[in-house]
Amino acid sequence: MEFLGGLNEAQKAAFTTAADRWVKVIVGDLPDVSVNGRIIDDLLIRAEGTSIDGPGVILGQAGPGLLRPPGGPGEFLPATGIMSFDTDDLASMQTKGTLVDVITHEMGHVIGLITSPARKKGLVKGIGGDNPVFRGQQAQEEYRKLRDADELKPVPVENEGEPGTRDAHWREKVFANELMTGFVKQAPNPLSRLTVGGLQDLGYVVDLDAADDYSLPSLLALAEEGELRTHIAPIDVGIVLPTIPTVLPSDSLVTAA
C-alpha cells in the first residue's frame, strides 16, 4: 500500500486490514516489473481520500492501473492499482461500520475480479447480454460444490445495474452477501472459495482453505423477508467508477540475475 493523502489513521488501517485479508488467500509471488525505473514487487496499490461530490453518488474510483504484459508469467495480472475515495463517503462508511468490507471488495477489483484482467484472459462471457458468466475452471468447480451438484456450470455474473456494477460482480440474486457481489452489506460479507477460485483462474497461487465459510442463500427465505430485489443501488450508497488499465510492454518484466 502507498497512501497518497486525504486519509485518517483509522481509514489507513482499514486499507491495511483489507490488504492483509487478500494476502491470506493469495500466497504466491508475481514476477517483478520495472515501471519508470521503479521495481514493482507483486502489486502496488495507491490509496487516497479526495473531494469528489459530497456524500453519495460517486464514492470514488478503483481498479487496476498497469497490467503485466501478455505471453509471459503473470500475464495481464495487475502491477499497480488505484483506490481513490470521496472523503465524505469514507467518513460515512466509517460511521456505518462498512468501511473495511467496502475497501476489501474494491481491492478485489484492483486485483482483477471481475475486471479487465479477467476479460483479457477470456474468462467472462456474454458481457452486455442477459446472462453474463465467468468460465474459469476452479470457480466453476467451487460453484458446483456450493450447488451440491454433479455437473459444472459457468458462474453467474451480475446482469443488472449500471456499468461498473453489471458484468463486473458475482450475481446478487444468486450469491447475496458474498463479498464480490455488487453491493456490500452489513457484515458478514464472506470472501468465499468461489472468489478464491476465481483468483486461481486469473493466474494467482492461492490457498482455498483460507476462504471464509459461505453457503448459497435460500432465495425463498430472502424473498419472504423482502431482501430479494432488483440490483439497484440505494440512493445514499453511490457507485465506484472502474479504471481503464494499460498493459505494460514485454521489456518491463524483470528477469532474475
Regions found by a protein language model. Give the residues of each.
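Extracellular zinc-dependent metalloprotease catalytic-domain scaffold
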Residues: 1-104, 109-257
